[in-house]
Swiss-Prot record:
The gene is VDAC2. The modification Phosphotyrosine is found at Y78. The modification N6-acetyllysine is found at K31, K120, K277. This is Non-selective voltage-gated ion channel VDAC2. The record marks K85 as: Involved in ceramide and phosphatidylcholine binding. The modification Phosphoserine is found at S251. It is found in: Mitochondrion outer membrane; Membrane. Signal peptide: none annotated.
């Protein structure tokens, strides 16, 4: 049994935020796939410490091309992060965040967006506080009709997790979101269940079977319907530079992805989605993504 002396701090166990509950299982389903898209991501960093991120994608079905540009500068001495964003919808965004300065574990963020074409403006203040066994969050969306308040809390103890998430619309004076979640996690196993607004029920299981193989199961059901959604996914690391991912759901949609690191900072991902119910009818999707980082 481990013991902790006066000069040896007990290891911290900070639970994830509510949005990150079940994230390990979702990542197996989502990462390594990009059906119907041709995508390019580029990340660079200047000598002065400014980070540049650009992303562009083309939808193979509609032909629509979208892109984003983001610049980020971290002033580590004061715990400040400045972020500027732009996208092809001509929406400009500015974000200022300060972390671990007012008190340890507290992060405050001021986020604004502006669309010159429509004149639409929005503002949001985000706050999060995380310490051992607790992770709290509170965001305020400012609107002319009245602000909306988003709150969340996750508590953890010896691997067990319990969370609550809500949204209060001050314009309507009522709760518009009321979610609960319970989970359990260890180093190679995670279980997550959730209830959204008393009508949507979901659960997921993540397990690291061995060093190279990760698996995930996802289940969802909405009350008042006979529709149950079920999926299985897996990721296998072929070697240090290549991995293959596969997933299938109860709608007979089969997805396969292959990721290869061509050289340090260059990663290629190929993916395909096949409709198992109509293999000969067409409608299948392919995807290609290239990530560059320097």
């Amino acid at each position: 049994m481990a013991t902790y002396g006066q000069n040896c701090a007990r290891p911290m166990c900070i639970p994830p935020s509510y949005a990150d509950l079940g994230k390990a299982a979702r990542d197996i389903f989502n990462k390594g796939f990009g059906f119907g898209l041709v995508k390019l991501d580029v990340k660079t960093k200047s000598c002065s410490g400014v980070e540049f991120s650009t992303s562009g994608s083309s939808n193979t079905d509609t032909g629509k091309v979208t892109g984003t540009l983001e610049t980020k500068y971290k002033w580590c001495e004061y715990g400040l992060t400045f972020t500027e964003k732009w996208n092809t919808d001509n929406t400009l965004g500015t974000e200022i965040a300060i972390e671990d300065q007012i008190c340890q574990g507290l992060k405050l963020t001021f986020d604004t967006t502006f669309s010159p074409n429509t004149g639409k403006k929005s503002g949001k203040i985000k706050s999060s506080y995380k310490r051992e066994c607790i992770n709290l969050g509170c965001d305020v969306d400012f609107d002319f009709a009245g602000p909306a308040i988003h709150g969340s809390a996750v508590f953890g103890y010896e691997g067990w997790l319990a969370g609550y998430q809500m949204t209060f619309d001050s314009a309507k004076s009522k709760l518009t979101r009321n979610n609960f979640a319970v989970g359990y996690r260890t180093g190679d196993f995670q279980l997550h269940t959730n209830v959204n607004d008393g009508t949507e029920f979901g659960g997921s299981i993540y397990q690291k079977v061995c060093e190279d193989l990760d698996t995930s199961v996802n289940l969802a059901w909405t009350s008042g319907t006979n529709c149950t959604r079920f999926g299985i996914a897996a990721k296998y690391q072929l070697d240090p530079t290549a991995s293959i991912s596969a997933k299938v759901n109860n709608s007979s949609l089969i997805g396969v992805g292959y990721t290869q690191t061509l050289r340090p900072g260059v990663k290629l991902t190929l993916s395909a989605l096949v409709d198992g119910k109509s293999i000969n009818a067409g409608g299948h999707k392919l995807g290609l993504a290239l990530e560059l980082e320097a």
